Structure formats: C-alpha cells, structure tokens
C-alpha cells in the first residue's frame, strides 16, 4: 500500500495535504467539489485552513480522487 499522506490534528497540514492530492490528480477545486458532493467553498475552506473537517467530510474528496483513508493506531498508544 502506497501512503500518499497523513491526516492529523493539525488543520494546516490537513489542508496542505488535500490541496497537494488535488493538484497531483489534476482536479480543479470546482471539479473536486462536484465529484465529492461538497461545495466549492467547502473545498477551498479546508485547503486554506478555515475549516477542520470531520473524518467523513475529509474522506469524500479523497475518495473522489481515488484515495482511501486508513485508520492506524499510533505507536505507543494502546
């Protein structure tokens, strides 16, 4: 399994990751919004750190671009 990125509690890192994935897959914000069922504003707001999306909301654009979100336990946390 190839890991494309990691969503964390850091709103800036999450926004940058979503933007990078979108650019790597050659989607415009509008195209991604339409394909994922989000508004163009919602995609923009995540990418520019205005919103911290719930996991379900973050998964929608990722899935639309062909990515899955995998949940993995952090080392040392049991």
Q: Which residues are covered by each model-predicted region?
A:
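Short basic helix-loop element that most often maps to the first helix and adjoining turn
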Residues: 16-34, 60
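Recognition helix of helix-turn-helix/homeodomain-like DNA-binding domains
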Residues: 37-53
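DNA major-groove recognition helix of helix-turn-helix/homeodomain DNA-binding modules
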Residues: 56-72
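Short amphipathic helical patch at the helix-1/turn junction of helix-turn-helix
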Residues: 12, 22-24, 52
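N-terminal flexible/basic segments that precede or flank functional cores
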Residues: 1-16, 63, 75-78
